[in-house]
C-alpha cells in the first residue's frame, strides 16, 4: 500500500487510476482535483491541480482512452465538469453540465462501445445521462429515479449481441433500481426494483464481466452488502455477502476487472475482499487496513 502525503488540504473522497494505471486522479472537500503521474509502484508525482468546482468534489471518472485524456468530476455545487488534457499537457474544462438542483453525488462513463456517455446521480432525486457528440455538442436525458436522493450508479456490461443501455442506481429510499433505455420514448424505464436494505444504499456496482453470471453488489448504511443475480426467469435474487453485520456503514463496493473479487470499504477504515466459492457462497479473501 502506498501513502501519498499532503495531497489535499481536506478529506479525500475518491481516487481513481486511468485505463493504463499510469495516472491517478483524486478529489477532495478542498474543492480541487489533483492529477498524479504514477512511476513504478511507489512514486506518485503531482502534475496538475484542477480548480473549477465551488464545493466538495465527491467523485472523478476517467473516460476510455479512445476518447482522449478526459476526466469527469461531480460536486456538492450541483455541477458536473468534464476536463480534457491538451497536447501541451495542460488541462481545461470542455463541458459543464448544470441540470441538477442539488449535490451531484456520482459520475460514471458508459462502456466505450456505447459512445462517450456520462451517467450522473444527484440528491435532487434525479439521474441524468449525457451523450457527447463528435462535433463537441451534447444532449441529455434527465428523469426522477429515487425521490429523496440518488447516491450512486453503475453501468451494466455490454452484451455484444444486444448492446442495450442498462444501469443500476442506489438511493436514499433504501432501494436499488435497474434501468434500461426506451429509445422510442427517449427516456429510461425501470426494469426492476431491488428491495432488501433497511437504510440508504450508499453504493452499487455491476460486475464488469458477464461471462459466467452477472452480479450487482449493493452497499448500505445498514451495514450490509447484498449480491444480486437474475434467475432463469429474469427475476432478481439476493444473497447476503456475509450473515454478520459489518462493523460500520458500508460506503463503497467495487468489483475486480474480471468480476470474481469484490472489495468493500466501510466506516471502520478497512477494505475487505470477498470471492465466491464453488458452492456459490461468498467468503473472505483478505483485508486491507487503511
Curated annotation (Swiss-Prot):
Tagged with keyword Membrane: yes
| Record's GO cellular component terms | COPII vesicle coat; endoplasmic reticulum membrane; GATOR2 complex; nuclear pore outer ring
Q: Where are the WD repeats?
A: 7-46, 52-93, 99-140, 145-189, 196-238, 245-284
| SUPFAM superfamilies in UniProt | WD40 repeat-like (SSF50978)
* Recorded GO MF terms: structural molecule activity
Membrane topology summary: Peripheral membrane protein
Keyword rRNA processing recorded: no
The family database entries (SMART domains) matched by this protein are listed as: WD40
Q: What keywords is this UniProt entry annotated with?
A: Cytoplasmic vesicle, Endoplasmic reticulum, ER-Golgi transport, Membrane, mRNA transport, Nuclear pore complex, Nucleus, Protein transport, Repeat, Translocation, Transport, WD repeat
**Pfam families recorded:** WD40 (PF00400)
A single Gene Ontology biological process assigned to it is: positive regulation of TORC1 signaling
Record's subcellular location: Cytoplasmic vesicle, COPII-coated vesicle membrane; Endoplasmic reticulum membrane; Nucleus, Nuclear pore complex
Q: According to its UniProt record, where is this protein mainly located?
A: membrane
This chain's function reads: Component of the coat protein complex II (COPII) which promotes the formation of transport vesicles from the endoplasmic reticulum (ER). The coat has two main functions, the physical deformation of the endoplasmic reticulum membrane into vesicles and the selection of cargo molecules. It also functions as a component of the nuclear pore complex (NPC). NPC components, collectively referred to as nucleoporins (NUPs), can play the role of both NPC structural components and of docking or interaction partners for transiently associated nuclear transport factors.
Q: Per the similarity annotation, which family is this? A: Belongs to the WD repeat SEC13 family.
* Quaternary structure annotation from Swiss-Prot or TrEMBL: The COPII coat is composed of at least 5 proteins: the SEC23/24 complex, the SEC13/31 complex, and the protein SAR1. Component of the nuclear pore complex (NPC). NPC constitutes the exclusive means of nucleocytoplasmic transport. NPCs allow the passive diffusion of ions and small molecules and the active, nuclear transport receptor-mediated bidirectional transport of macromolecules such as proteins, RNAs, ribonucleoparticles (RNPs), and ribosomal subunits across the nuclear envelope. Due to its 8-fold rotational symmetry, all subunits are present with 8 copies or multiples thereof.
What name appears for this protein in its UniProt entry?
Answer: Protein transport protein SEC13
State the organism of origin: Meyerozyma guilliermondii (strain ATCC 6260 / CBS 566 / DSM 6381 / JCM 1539 / NBRC 10279 / NRRL Y-324)
Amino acid at each position: 500500500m502506498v501513502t501519498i502525503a499532503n495531497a489535499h488540504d481536506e478529506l479525500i473522497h475518491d481516487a481513481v487510476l486511468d485505463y493504463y494505471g499510469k495516472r491517478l486522479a483524486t478529489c477532495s472537500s478542498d474543492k480541487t482535483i489533483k492529477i498524479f503521474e504514477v512511476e513504478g509502484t511507489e512514486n506518485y508525482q503531482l502534475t496538475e491541480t484542477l480548480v473549477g468546482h465551488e464545493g466538495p468534489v465527491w467523485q472523478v471518472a476517467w473516460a476510455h482512452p479512445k476518447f482522449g485524456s478526459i476526466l469527469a468530476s461531480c460536486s456538492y455545487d450541483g455541477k458536473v465538469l468534464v476536463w480534457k488534457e491538451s497536447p501541451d499537457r495542460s488541462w481545461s474544462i470542455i463541458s459543464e453540465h448544470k441540470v441538477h438542483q442539488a449535490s451531484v453525488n456520482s459520475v460514471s462513463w458508459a462502456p466505450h462501445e456505447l459512445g462517450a456517455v456520462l451517467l450522473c446521480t444527484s440528491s435532487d432525486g434525479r439521474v441524468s445521462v449525457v451523450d457527447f457528440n463528435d462535433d463537441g455538442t451534447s444532449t441529455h436525458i434527465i428523469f426522477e429515479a429515487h425521490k429523496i436522493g440518488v447516491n450512486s450508479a453503475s453501468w451494466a456490461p455490454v452484451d455484444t449481441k444486444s448492446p442495450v443501455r442498462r444501469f443500476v442506481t442506489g438511493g436514499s429510499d433504501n432501494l436499488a433500481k435497474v434501468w434500461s433505455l426506451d429509445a422510442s420514448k427517449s427516456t429510461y424505464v425501470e426494469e426492476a426494483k431491488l428491495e432488501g436494505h433497511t437504510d440508504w444504499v450508499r453504493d452499487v456496482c455491476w460486475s464488469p464481466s458477464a461471462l459466467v453470471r452477472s452480479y450487482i453488489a449493493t452497499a448500505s448504511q445498514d451495514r450490509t452488502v447484498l449480491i444480486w443475480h437474475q434467475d432463469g426467469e429474469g427475476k432478481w435474487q439476493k444473497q447476503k455477502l456475509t450473515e454478520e453485520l459489518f462493523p460500520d456503514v458500508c460506503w463503497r463496493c467495487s468489483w475486480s476487472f474480471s468480476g470474481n473479487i469484490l472489495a468493500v470499504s466501510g466506516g471502520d477504515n478497512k477494505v475487505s475482499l470477498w470471492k465466491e466459492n464453488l458452492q456459490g457462497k461468498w467468503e473472505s479473501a483478505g483485508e486491507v487496513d487503511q
